[in-house]
Amino acid sequence: MIKNIIFDVGDVLIEYRWKQMLVDFGCNETDAERIGREMFDDPDRLWSTFDLGVRSDESIIEEFCKKHPEDSDAIRWFISHGEYMHVPRPSVWKRVHELKEKGYGIYLLSNYPESLFKKHTEYADFMKDIDGMMVSYMIHKGKPERDIYEALCDKYRLDRSE
């Protein structure tokens, strides 16, 4: 019997408007797409390192800027102003609340750097319904690796069959 539900944050409980954010900064659509690829599809997986919380925001910014000096202003602004990146999904938040009222345990399992997680969840209504969470920056492990899931289950003594 299902007693607990585990949600991801990004692209589940909130949406990202990363491309529009870069356009708001002053990039055209083509440049915004390219800069997004530079950050999110980086062959060195620098954004994944950022999610793991093993390096400071500033060191991640500096590394990206060193790799892409022509885009350093946009990259620096983008990472430093992550509060503009997320979009609330109130209909999903309402559903989370309904599940909580029905007695389900509600948990978060997500890849996030600490600074962005705090900016994206600070005023999120769904947070009041959360029974526990494991975010990559907390244990320096990320999805899809099983370790982060096991850490969530162990911390909150969740029966994996429920």
Task: Outline where the language-model segments fall.
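Substrate-recognition "cap/lid" segment bordering the active-site pocket of phosphatases
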Residues: E114-E162
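Short, acidic loop-to-helix structural element flanking the phosphoryl-transfer center
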Residues: N4, D73-Y107, K118, R146
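Short, surface-exposed acidic
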Residues: C27-M39, P69-S80, R160-S161
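A metal-dependent, Asp-based hydrolase signature
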Residues: W47-W77
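Short, solvent-exposed loop/turn segments at secondary-structure junctions
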Residues: V12-L13, W18-Q20, Y112-S115, I139-H140
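Generic structural signal for small/hydrophobic residues in well-ordered secondary structure
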Residues: D8-D11, G53, L99, L108, ...
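Active-site neighborhood of HAD-like aspartate-dependent phosphohydrolases
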Residues: M1-D42, K66
